[in-house]
Amino acid sequence: MPREIAISRRTLLAGAGTSLALVLAGCRHTLADSAAPFGFPDWSRAETIAKSVRPPVIPARQSVVAAVAEGQDARPAIQSAVETLHADGGGRVVLGAGVWLSDGPIHLRSGIELHLQEGATLRFLGNADKYLPAVLTRWEGTDVWSYSPMIYAHRAHDVAVTGPGTIDGQGEANFLPWRKDQGPIQRLLRDFGRDGVPVAERVFTGERRLRPHFVQFHQCERVLIEGVTLRDSPFWMVHPVYCQDVTVRGIRCISLHINSDGVDPDSSRRVLIENCTFEVGDDGVAIKSGRDQDGWRVGIPSEQIVVRNCIYGGTIGGAVAIGSEMSGGVRDVWIENWRIAKSNHALYFKANLDRGGMIRDVHARNFEIGETAAAVIFTNDYHSYRGGNAPPDFGRVTVENFRVAKADYGLAIQGHPTAPVHDVLVRRMVIDEATTPIELSHGTNIVLDSVMMNGRSVTLADAVPWAPGKRH
């Protein structure tokens, strides 16, 4: 059974502000003593974005898929219901209680909602050939034709996956073993992206196999995924790529092996992620926008994103990341009200010197954290550096109201001499125990306001240079 978080969402949300205020009552360093690097964020912007996200419009008609014999492939019946309803103008495809086996992907169409009722489990099988023919996808930031995601929609509008049921990818047994042979294939795809090989010629199947995504919406508008439990992903779990108006609400992601990111908005606009629980072996939410030259070629940022009221219940991953595939840019992001029992990191801005691109106007507040390797990290030296000369630009970031019990690193910032991390405000942060409170190399206009670690006020005078070693 997955580990349950002992503290309720209501208790955490109610207690965070009070405890932080009490601790900071004796901390006297304020912005009267040091000017903010830029204006304070207007958090009403987050609500404006959330309200601007357009929900899908699904017609009222529905099709209840008839039960199939135990152990039989239900995919033909499910896909037939999708196609029939789509031809009629759209509607809801309903899976009732029981186990529904799918020997291959379900492809959604415009106007379709796949609804899993209480007690329904949609379980995907591991026959790789059934996830062919190849579809257009984006794999770790590079466009490619490869194995279909298990649930996939391409150039669809008004599309949804909803309900209290479960979707089981059986990824650890069937697809994670592909990872051991992945290195050369992964590098080849990155070479194709760097060298500008036409996307139509990037076909990665057979011996060039890449693990499929779990649920991917590709070039879609007005998308909703709500209420479902996603379990045991083959790769990234929910991956909106080149999408607009995406709502992810009240889902639970359970997948404790590597690369099982929960939700990865990728070159997408107007995205709302709220009230979700992540019990994953990687990032709960990772905001992305393409890798290196291929990301520059496309040039679509991720922007106007709100992530709020979520719980991270993994132990070996992290709660929220920006990057590392962020070459198209990430901007106008608002993150608030996270509760984290244990993690490698709470908030991670990551890229390397190949990426280029920029991260701008990202604001995070109200994090309650138990134990973490690093509370907040900025680095442009993330692994897989390929020798380029395109340092990313990180700037205009605020971090406020962070309450941490224990951290190996409190705040760690690694910029580059030609591209320092700049214009960062950290205020009202309390860490009870921090082995290394602050590391800082190549940062400008970094401001700390009411930051306490190890029971005392901390300023930039306490910072030590970034040292080699793992922080996440």
Model-derived features: where do they sit?
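Extracellular beta-rich repeat passengers
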Residues: 326, 337, 343-472
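Extracellular "leader-to-stem" segments immediately downstream of a signal peptide or signal-anchor
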Residues: 2-113, 117-226, 249-251, 255, ...
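Alpha-helix capping and helix-loop boundary segments enriched in small/acidic/polar residues
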Residues: 69-72, 260, 264, 268, ...
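Short, T/G/N/S-enriched strand-turn elements that build extracellular solenoid repeat scaffolds
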Residues: 82-84, 101-109, 236-242, 275, ...
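Residue-level marker of regulatory loop/turn positions in helix-turn-helix DNA-binding domains and
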Residues: 5, 207-209, 217, 240, ...
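Short glycine/acidic-rich loop motifs that flank beta-strands on beta-rich extracellular proteins
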Residues: 90, 103-105, 125-127, 148, ...
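Right-handed parallel beta-helix
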Residues: 118-119, 157-165, 221-231, 244-255, ...
